[in-house]
Amino acid sequence: RVVYHQLDSGEEQAALLLMATSGLRRSEVLGLTPSNFDLENRGVYPQKADGQTTKQQWMSFYSPDTEAKLFNEYDFDQMDPDEPLFTRHPSTFTHNFADASGKVDSMRITPQVLRVWFCQKMSSLGVADRHIDAFCGRTSRSVLANHYSDYTPENLQSIYEDAGISVLD
């Protein structure tokens, strides 16, 4: 939370919140466009450059505080559906996150640290590992997992909402 408040730009704050509450990789978050969002359900469908869904990912979600920041920073209705939300170079985000961490004598925060924090936080909130893996784009390819695990968007959203992850609370 303290690192978030040290960031100078709303764009960087929005990126930090998305990385921390969705479990997505830096490249996935920084490649997002308005067309990747399901705004009604706070869902996000990251895509690779070729337009394919990343790895085996169905979708991930983001928290209410992230939603508020996104709507504060971006007017999704006025943006082109394929216009990137984040315009800075990826290394700029990593560098500025680390600088903000240093200002408050915090552990060095990087996009990877935020992804690890997401996994640990969701686990501490009682979310099963297989669902955390799904949010992070690591669904199993095993027959057992494919046929007996419910990775529907509705089920994943319910699990995410029940966990109640937040950075700013």
Say what each PLM segment does:
Residues 63-107, 118:
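Active-site/catalytic core of tyrosine-dependent DNA strand-transfer enzymes
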Residues 1-26, 115:
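Basic, Lys/Arg- and aromatic-enriched nucleic-acid-binding interface segment
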Residues 17, 21, 113-139:
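C-terminal catalytic core of tyrosine-transesterase DNA break-rejoin enzymes
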Residues 22, 31-70:
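Conserved tyrosine-mediated DNA breakage-rejoining catalytic core shared by Y-recombinases
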Residues 5, 10, 89-92, 108-113:
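N-terminal core-binding DNA-recognition domain of tyrosine site-specific recombinases/integrases
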Residues 11, 25, 57-60, 71-75, ...:
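Short, cationic motifs built from Arg/Lys/His that form the positively charged side of catalytic pockets
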Residues 37-39, 108, 127-147:
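Short, polar N-cap/turn motifs at the start of nucleic acid-interacting alpha helices
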Residues 52, 136-165:
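Catalytic-site neighborhood detector that most strongly recognizes the C-terminal catalytic loop/helix
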